[in-house]
Amino acid sequence: MRLTGASPDGWGSISADRQFLKALREYCDRTGTQLIYDEVVTGFRLGLGGAKGYFVKPDLTVLGKIIGGGLPIGAICGRRDVMEHMDHTKYSGMEYFYHGGSFAGNPITLAAGLATINVLEHSPVYEHIAKLGNMARQDMSRIFEDADFPAQAVGVGSLFAIHLTNKKPLKDISDFISDLAQSKRRFNYLLENGIVILIPEMMHGAASYAHKEKDINYLTTCVENVKSRS
């Protein structure tokens, strides 16, 4: 089993290297190992196909969050020949796999999830949030470059992150975990001004369908103000 994320939001919104994913796929094929993607964050955020539509297809994918339409949910999906081992009409007992629980297949959650998929399929959600994500990254990058400030904005789709370093490319957590005290001061300033982003060590966030361009403009204004705080 190899569990990874193709576009790991929890790793500072730095996409996994394509050659790394390709090498993982080749290794798993060679050894008979299942390649599993953790798409609890990226699944349905980067597209209905998740991040697996960007790079290398996994054998299994773990999903959560938005697929429940705001209600608690978790899901596993994957290749038919792998998933059919959960079918007890074909494989009796617990010979291969057992799955069950008090909330498995909760009808209210599944109905909310289907309604969410319908909205994602028939509304310009992905175009809108990707546009805002690109806008946020480009505007913040311009601010940093114009001020010759050692920081960069990265991400994909609607995801964005701020890293207080000029080092490129970012490949390891040590590349962007910098002065924590400085990061906390800037994080707190943004929070005090209504900008909620995740953890000062890796300041990252995401645009939603409810956000507008004016919200991104406000974000970048706050970032421009915070860059000078030490």
Give residue ranges: language-model regions.
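Conserved N-terminal phosphate-binding loop of PLP-dependent enzymes in the Aspartate aminotransferase
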Residues: 1-230
